């Protein structure tokens, strides 16, 4: 079963194929496995990309570059690094100088036509890390990020969530929010880290 959908202005897509979610990073993963030679100049994405996808890219010998979050930042780094392809996990696929959800959808359909059995196997074999984004409205996001990333609790949580995990704090570029990314091989680790971060926020009275 195949479902494809676009966002309001048509520059992002998301889909479902045989119950597998298809988004920007999954489509990139499929492309590098079927058209490895097309990405010799490298691929650009953002810190929101699952580390398993990053590993898959570099394993293929493809240079990987990371920009700040936002399609304009991805574009800028693509130009700087002479890359013809970039993506965001949210569904943006960026081709040289534009992003087009319809084209992204057609590319996925062309991959199915080329080798549907291989697509099925690639999707079945892919084991992404568990990933969660938390959003908080805080009194002072910059101060919070500085304080927690220089705290003993942060060092402890980093040690706990590794290997293969990470904690990323960033200030939203579109809303007055602190966004926290938790990624780990273990759901249990993500739950524990989230609980400890929320306790820190409560203890330090960071919430507005």
Regions found by a protein language model. Give the residues of each.
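Phosphate-binding and adjacent anionic-ligand microenvironments
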Residues: 38-208
């Amino acid at each position: 079963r195949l479902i494809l959908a676009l966002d309001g202005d048509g520059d992002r897509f998301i889909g479902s194929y045989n119950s597998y979610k298809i988004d920007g990073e999954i489509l990139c993963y499929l492309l590098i496995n079927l058209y490895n030679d097309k990405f010799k100049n490298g691929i650009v994405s953002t810190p929101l990309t699952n580390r398993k996808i990053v590993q898959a890219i570099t394993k293929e010998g493809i240079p990987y570059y990371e920009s700040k979050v936002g399609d304009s930042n991805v574009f800028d780094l693509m130009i700087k690094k002479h890359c013809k392809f970039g993506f965001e996990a949210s569904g943006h696929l960026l081709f040289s100088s534009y992003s087009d959800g319809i084209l992204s959808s057609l590319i996925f359909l062309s991959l199915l036509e080329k080798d549907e059995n291989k697509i099925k196997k690639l999707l079945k074999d892919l084991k992404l890390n568990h990933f969660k984004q938390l959003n908080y409205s805080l009194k002072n996001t910059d101060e919070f990020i500085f304080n927690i990333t220089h705290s003993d609790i942060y060092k402890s949580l980093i040690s706990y969530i590794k290997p293969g995990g990470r904690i990323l704090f960033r200030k939203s570029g579109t809303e007055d929010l602190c966004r926290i990314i938790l990624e780990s091989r273990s759901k249990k680790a993500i739950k524990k880290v989230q609980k400890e971060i929320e306790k820190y926020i409560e203890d330090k009275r960071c919430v507005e």
